[in-house]
């Protein structure tokens, strides 16, 4: 069994059936609110892509995608997506979206190398979204303005859930707090990245950490990011303090995407310049793709957070080892 935290005297606030109803209500409300706040149109999304397209998300560069061949197109190496970070940018181009317009998808993925715990599963479900901006809008103000719009959706969703289930108490602060990963390291130099996240979230409740992927003054990274979608200076993670765990929980990762210059720079730093030859990267370097901002928002994470669940398996059906299943059942954690 991987790391599993059991909250003391945990009792779910909703029954299994109530939970299933609440999941649907919550997802519908959040999705509608997000689309309205960011001017997004829902589009259909692929479950798998061809490896040779360069469209799959390489995450931290070491995770193995689920792959298979197919009878009809034997020359293709098909991969289950990790996320749609690069696919969305291409879709905005293909579907002829305009400045200020965006898309979102219901993204389902399998991350076979994920370490299982209370908030991590091999099954990933998230709203993947992407929006067109001008080159001049590739700045921190655009990033912060978008984060505030997304946070307003979180706030409205909490209000909605509390109105439906009054025994669930509000915990989100009125406003989101911004801090850079370097400021965070300077503030807590003796803590690990994850410990810093919890420390700052315990203080402010809801925090957006700016600048993830590049090295800090210490020579360490706050966290890893693939070099070919986020600009490491204009991205970040949205985290909330979760009292049930007494820890910070990441609900969303997002950022302004790489332009031609930052793509080349980050590919060089990451020592994977060979990706320049892939179709997606060629289109980007030739200026054929729009400048964008985008991200992913975890659906199960949101349901877990707002319904005050102790395990992500209480809001999604996935695969768990027998020890984890037994321990959860012994502690009122009812996995779907």
Curated annotation (Swiss-Prot):
Pfam family name, one: AsnA
Name of the top EC class for this enzyme: ligase
Kindly state a single biological-process term from the GO annotations of this entry. Answer: L-asparagine biosynthetic process
- Lineage, top-rank taxon, reads Bacteria
Which Enzyme Commission numbers does its entry carry?
6.3.1.1
Alphabetized GO MF terms: aspartate-ammonia ligase activity; ATP binding; catalytic activity, acting on a protein; transferase activity
Which reaction does this enzyme catalyse, per its entry? Answer: L-aspartate + NH4(+) + ATP = L-asparagine + AMP + diphosphate + H(+)
The GO cellular component terms are:
cytosol
The cross-references to InterPro entries, in alphabetical order and at most eight, read:
aa-tRNA-synth_II, aa-tRNA-synth_II/BPL/LPL, AsnA
State the pathway, as annotated in the record: Amino-acid biosynthesis; L-asparagine biosynthesis; L-asparagine from L-aspartate (ammonia route): step 1/1
The protein's UniProt keywords, in alphabetical order, are:
Amino-acid biosynthesis, Asparagine biosynthesis, ATP-binding, Cytoplasm, Ligase, Nucleotide-binding
**Where does the protein end up?**
Cytoplasm
Which residues, by range, are in coiled-coil regions?
A: none
- Give the HAMAP family listed for this entry: AsnA
State the similarity comment: Belongs to the class-II aminoacyl-tRNA synthetase family. AsnA subfamily.
Give the matching PANTHER family. ASPARTATE--AMMONIA LIGASE
Task: State what protein this is by name.
Answer: Aspartate--ammonia ligase
Q: What gene is this protein a product of?
A: asnA
